[in-house]
Regions:
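HotDog/MaoC-like acyl-thioester-processing domains
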Residues: 1-11, 91-142
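Hot-dog-fold acyl-thioester-processing enzymes
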Residues: 1-78, 141-142
Length: 142
């Protein structure tokens, strides 16, 4: 199954991926990436930060953008080429994060698409935003 090709995409088209952050997500992400920053995994340490509690890794939310791109828009077969990120607010265990991608530019000649990317929490607060450059899948040659 392939995602949408360049000629099937429409400016303003959107897709979302939603996930609630769990303790296991943070511990597994720390283990996979090697990012054992105590702000993420040590509650006693985190109590003394300006967040006052542990926070999720910012890049964990960026992974949700990757899921929206790779599985929904444009979807399977998409090549993720570039991502700019701005971390706007902390994410905590129990927060429900919705990654949203929106087609903002289409370059049919180069088979490139620019996507506006955001992650919002359950309150609608944007916790991360940015822009992605992708190459959508091409139709298989017959």
């Amino acid at each position: 199954m392939l995602g949408k090709t360049i000629d099937e995409l429409v400016l303003g088209e959107t897709a979302e991926f939603t996930k609630t952050i769990t303790e296991a997500d943070i511990i597994l992400f720390a283990g996979v990436t090697g990012d054992l920053n105590p702000a993420h995994i040590n509650e006693e340490y985190a109590k003394n930060t300006f967040f006052k509690t542990r926070i999720a890794h910012g890049i964990l939310q960026a992974g949700f953008i990757s899921a929206a791109i790779g599985m929904k828009l444009p979807g399977p077969g998409t090549i993720y080429m570039k991502q700019e990120l701005n971390f706007r607010a902390p994410v905590h265990i129990g927060d429900t994060i919705t990654a949203r991608v929106e087609v903002s530019q289409i370059d049919e000649e180069k088979n490139r698409v620019v996507l506006k990317t955001t992650c919002s929490n359950q309150e609608g607060e944007i916790v991360l935003d940015g822009e992605a450059l992708v190459s959508p899948p091409k139709k298989p040659k017959e």
